[in-house]
Amino acid sequence: MKKRISTIANLVQSFNPKLVYDIGCDHSYLTSYLIKTNQNLTIVNSDISKNALLSNYQKFKNNNNIHFFVSDGFNNLPELNINPKIGVIAGLGGLKIINIISQKENFINRFVIQPQSNLIELRSFLSLNSWDIVNETLVQDREFIYPILVIEKLKKPFKLTKELVILGPKLINFKDKHCLMKHYQCLLRVYQPKQKPSLMDLKIIETLNKIITSYESS
């Protein structure tokens, strides 16, 4: 978990924000990491679980820059007048991330997101709804490989090809090819067992098999 959290934190810090919204903060590990390097950073932690937030509040109650809200996504979050701001949604399923950033209350145009599932469906949504994937990386933490994306809202639509939705427009040039192929193999195992695959499922299987075979024969 340390490597995953530190990678998310480093991506957040690369934008030099003054305000961070950690949506679905769970145990507020990200807040703990961020305030070690920037005591002046304002951080809003939100979670659907009141009990989780109460436990986190006890750890940070003496820091006036750290705030806590029980909220399902943006439903109960205040828009603080501090800029630049960035949102983080990490450790939730891809469909839940889609739900959150689609909420009409959403006031954030840049996020670091780390989906636990439905990565391809998430990329497809981003492409169809004017969200640009400006960065994407993989982090291997113990036996798990986590995709982490930085996304920004565009003023004009920008659609990815099906192949780039499947493979990732930034991941195709990922330097650690061994880690990348392990990631693609994990994705392939999600789609292969389906009894009634859709046309998109078949395209995903074909595309992943093709790039994995190409790597193994090189």
Curated annotation (Swiss-Prot):
GO terms for molecular function: tRNA (adenine(22)-N1)-methyltransferase activity. SUPFAM superfamilies: S-adenosyl-L-methionine-dependent methyltransferases. InterPro entries: SAM-dependent_MTases_sf, TrmK. Its EC number is 2.1.1.-. GO terms for cellular component: cytoplasm. Disulfide bonds: none annotated. It is an enzyme of class 2 (transferase). Keywords: Cytoplasm, Methyltransferase, S-adenosyl-L-methionine, Transferase, tRNA processing. One of its GO terms (biological process) is methylation. Belongs to the TrmK family. PANTHER family: TRNA (ADENINE(22)-N(1))-METHYLTRANSFERASE. This is Putative tRNA methyltransferase MG248.
